[in-house]
Amino acid sequence: MNNNAFLNQVGGVSLALGMALTVGAITPLSAQAQELDPNATEVLQFMSDYLADTEAFSVNADVDFEIVANTGQKLQFSSYASMVMQRPTGLFIQRRGPLADAEIFFDGSQITLFGRRLNAYAEIPLSGTIDDAIRTMEAETGLPFPGADLMFADPFAVLSDGVESSTYLGTAYIDGVEVHHLAFREADVDWQLWVQTGDRPLPMKYVITTKWVTGAPEYSIRLRDWNTSPQIGANRFTFTPPAGATLLEALPPSELEDYQEAQ
């Protein structure tokens, strides 16, 4: 991607879009959203290639997810996540929220799910890659892992699968950083991605909207503290049970419940 040329175009697109929305001229945007926008595809591909070529990284995230109660009231819950990854076989995820306080370890030979509140853990033997670990965790627990798309060896293939239309919405700012704003539509969900401009196209925000569920609940991830050259300890991806920890066949769903709300 020629970033300088592209950014020169971005300013004009943003201004035109802002003027169109100001005067209520939404028809052109609606028409544009019915097809794949090459600018959105270009940014998504650039980001995906960058992540795929990054051998190791660490990142923290603030996660907000919504649920719609039986009364129709929409509630939002917040949690925190931290991840360290070293391709192709090292993954550590920590998640703390109103329900879950869990850690996930993968060292290329075994997945370990550790529930801190229960001081209990479950093991899943698996010889494979991070891609295999993500798919196995979803299959074994029955829970989706929103945002895991960004961890795959080929993020573009996973993210673009099922996309029916896309739109490049210009640039914005997240935490003072200029970002490209992309919007995508699939059959059951809409999702948006904010990607840092320049030569480090890191994802800064990811929002998934489940559009056919009453209230259209959203799952939002703000990614921060990116480190693409982390110092990783030799045992970072290997679980060592703490004193008194219990080995279970599987963790209760409540220990991972925060992962369940956005589908």
Annotate the PLM regions.
Residues G12-A25:
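Bacterial N-terminal signal peptides
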Residues Q34-V43, F114-E178, P241, D258-A262:
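Flexible, processing/modification-adjacent segments and terminal tails
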Residues E35-P38, D62, T112-L113, A122, ...:
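Gly/Pro-enriched, hydrophobic low-complexity segments
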Residues I26-A33:
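Sec/Tat signal peptide C-region and signal peptidase I cleavage site
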Residues E249-Q263:
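A short, highly charged, low-complexity intrinsically disordered segment
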Residues M1-N8:
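N-terminal secretory signal peptides that target proteins for export/translocation
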Residues E35-A120:
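N-terminal mature ectodomain segment of secretory-pathway/periplasmic proteins
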Residues N70, A102-F106, G115, E123-L126, ...:
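A short, polar/proline- and glycine-enriched secondary-structure boundary/capping micro-motif
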